[in-house]
Amino acid sequence: MIEVKHITKSFEGRAVLKDINAVFENGKTNLIIGRSGSGKTVLIKNIIGLMRPDHGEILYDGRDLISMNKNELNMLRREMGMLFQGSALFDSMTVLENVMFPLDMFSRDSFKERKKRAEFCLERVNLSDAEHLYPSEISGGMMKRAAIARAIALNPQYLFCDEPNSGLDPKTSLLIDDLIHDITVEYNMTTVINTHDMNSVMNIGENIIFIKEGVKEWQGTKEQVITSNNKALNDFIFASDLARKVKEVEMQHGSASRRAT
């Protein structure tokens, strides 16, 4: 579990996070949602220690991130898995080598054991057949699954995902959502997902935190989203749904244009 208590953060006198209080629950998919520029990314960066808040506490199962020394912070980061907006795979490495990378960096196991662990993670995301391929030889969805395999290679307690469905079609996005959720439950991790995708919210949003202009406006479950009378949240949902429909039309138009040519 991760607890955020009274977090504030300002840049050049402008408040970006304003007294944020939130609990990210263990074994659940915790989603931070909001418009671009709302403070979601800054909040994530503070939580993982890439930024330091001006005030407040960030507790990892009771351990205070802000008071940690460099060695303690490095040890904590080894308990974190990261899934970035792009796949962030190394082009010069095979899929298997990409998944082995964090193991080669931080694990003291033998090469044989590290390779076995990487192969297990690839099997878990249904990519065993692609382990000897390079990123340029696989699809965007497969690259995302490879990135998930790499993120769980060190058996993390905490998983952080930044817009994991960015650039994916709706069907593939659904598969990635389900995979992240299932792995969260299996590993009993605390998973924090930064997204503005309402499909993800309604699919796997077990604990949802809505941020607007640096303020936590609302927190609840996907079931409570439907019945919420929070105007800011409802406006965000409407805008997100409209943007999704426009994107679907553009994708359909693009497919039709390609067929015509």
Where are these regions (language model features)?
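Conserved ABC ATPase signature
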Residues: 134-138, 142
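C-terminal boundary and immediately downstream tail of ABC-type ATPase nucleotide-binding domains
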Residues: 223-261
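Helix N-cap at the start of a conserved alpha-helix in ABC-type nucleotide-binding domains
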Residues: 170-172
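Catalytic Walker B motif of ABC-type/P-loop ATPase nucleotide-binding domains
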Residues: 159-162
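A short, proline-enriched helix->beta-strand linker immediately N-terminal to the Walker B motif
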Residues: 153-157
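Helix-to-loop junction immediately C-terminal to a conserved catalytic motif
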Residues: 48
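Conserved ABC transporter NBD signature motif
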Residues: 56-64
